[in-house]
């Protein structure tokens, strides 16, 4: 059984200097990244994905950015999330850009690449 994290969003108590969150970014992490901190810590370290996401959400909020973090081991779930936060979302729910670490899907997923292109939002791997 694989775990899929629910989207994690910045909340108001993370905002610094009363800045409003003016941009929205989607951070996507792919296959096996949920094991960070547990899997081969001598190679990948002891920091968990949850720790990394929490740190990034706090840092993004300082710059007025709402960061939505998702992780899945399932290719179709990642495609669904890309579509949801892009073309299928109401304007207010759409993200401004996507940051993706597809992990093993980097070499094999035409579906994720197609979803990113169809989304018509800037993205970076």
For each predicted feature, which ranges?
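Short coil-to-helix leader/linker segments, especially the first N-terminal amphipathic alpha-helix
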Residues: 1-15
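Short, acidic/small-residue loops that bind anionic groups at enzyme active sites
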Residues: 117-125
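Glycine- and acidic-residue-enriched helix-capping/strand-helix junction motifs
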Residues: 36-51
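Extreme N-terminal starter segment of soluble prokaryotic enzymes
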Residues: 21-25
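Glycine-rich, phosphate-binding/catalytic loops in enzymes
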Residues: 43-45, 115-118
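Helix-adjacent hinge/juxtasegments
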Residues: 57-58, 63-117
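ATP/NTP phosphate-donor binding region
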Residues: 33
């Amino acid at each position: 059984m694989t775990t899929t994290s629910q989207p994690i969003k910045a909340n108001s108590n993370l905002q610094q200097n009363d800045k409003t969150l003016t941009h929205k970014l989607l951070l996507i992490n792919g296959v096996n990244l949920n094991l960070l901190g547990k899997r081969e810590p001598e190679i990948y370290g002891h920091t968990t994905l949850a720790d990394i996401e929490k740190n990034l959400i706090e840092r993004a909020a300082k710059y007025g950015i709402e960061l939505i973090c998702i992780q899945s081991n399932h290719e179709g779930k990642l495609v669904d999330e890309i579509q949801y936060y892009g073309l299928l979302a109401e304007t207010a729910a759409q993200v401004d850009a996507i940051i993706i670490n597809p992990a093993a899907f980097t070499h094999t997923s035409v579906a994720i690449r197609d979803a990113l292109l169809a989304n018509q939002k800037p993205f970076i791997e």
